Amino acid sequence: MDHLPMPKFGPLAGLRVVFSGIEIAGPFAGQMFAEWGAEVIWIENVAWADTIRVQPNYPQLSRRNLHALSLNIFKDEGREAFLKLMETTDIFIEASKGPAFARRGITDEVLWQHNPKLVIAHLSGFGQYGTEEYTNLPAYNTIAQAFSGYLIQNGDVDQPMPAFPYTADYFSGLTATTAALAALHKVRETGKGESIDIAMYEVMLRMGQYFMMDYFNGGEMCPRMTKGKDPYYAGCGLYKCADGYIVMELVGITQIAECFKDIGLAHLLGTPEIPEGTQLIHRIECPYGPLVEEKLDAWLAAHTIAEVKERFAELNIACAKVLTVPELESNPQYVARESITQWQTMDGRTCKGPNIMPKFKNNPGQIWRGMPSHGMDTAAILKNIGYSENDIQELVSKGLAKVED
């Protein structure tokens, strides 16, 4: 198979990935593959472009390194072209409502007839099967969080709150990436394709288990946090200093002992409630939990962030300033690692945003292209799989494909 024109780089060079999906979850999986060197083809509707394009800046990040194919994959010759593309594809990712592809005649079995080794990742809110009440429902970030038990754990004591920005979308997209790579590893051993059913709510159910396991195995449900503080442990979470906010984790025998001396609670060490060797202070079970919070709040409020960071470094207490977005660019760690970078958009503008992550030492990722326009690579992709100029024009004339104007 000849690949589309692009530089060769990263650990996934030579891999062909195709995805069909809008907004964030499914495309995020595709983006990860593209930044790690895979050739990634982004399928868009012919009549309506991906709704993410209405955003002014985010798409330049989320759709960089992609090849844009505008094709009606469910109808007539458009469907034929899609299935021909699948013959040269390693991984196909689709994000839709339940078994939408199967309902429209593109089942796993149809895809495997064209490519027995194909890895297929289905990403939806509620999965490919289950009850009709849920399976075919649309789902976004907040829906998946609400249905999974994740949302109810977040927020404040007075009201639950979803985690933003769009946590369920990113977790689900990354799950699709890792699951597809796991499946591909097995396919290369067996020669038999795989189909993966990724339900966004199940992803969030798995991510939200730290506290829920206590309910499933004893009936105890953890309360929500208070003003950003850990719901279980004193000295953990968000705190206010004289000039801003920090997060800290008061964990460890010596850390607690030394911190208690600073905040005036050394006399509690070695008591039945806080015996020698205590590594965590339970804010509910320990009767002194509220007092620890009161004293710690007062001490932190009387010191600047710089003073707190210096003292906590001496005590080996983990803490960090809550950075504002403008502070990111000038932070020395960001600068040293080039965590924020710049690249050129297709129309020649400079775009700034997050760099490739993670950092591969021997086969690093690369930003080689900005977001392509709607249908920009349709002709090149169709030619790559054997279509002539006349074939492509016929698809366009029938409204089954769109090429760049």
Curated annotation (Swiss-Prot):
Keyword Cytoplasm: yes
Pathway(s) where this gene product acts: Amine and polyamine metabolism; carnitine metabolism
Domain of life: Bacteria
Pfam families: CoA_transf_3
Gene Ontology CC terms: cytoplasm
Family: Belongs to the CoA-transferase III family. CaiB subfamily.
Active site: residue positions: 169
Residues the record lists as binding CoA: 97, 104
Protein's recorded name: L-carnitine CoA-transferase
HAMAP family: CaiB
Predominant location category: cytoplasm
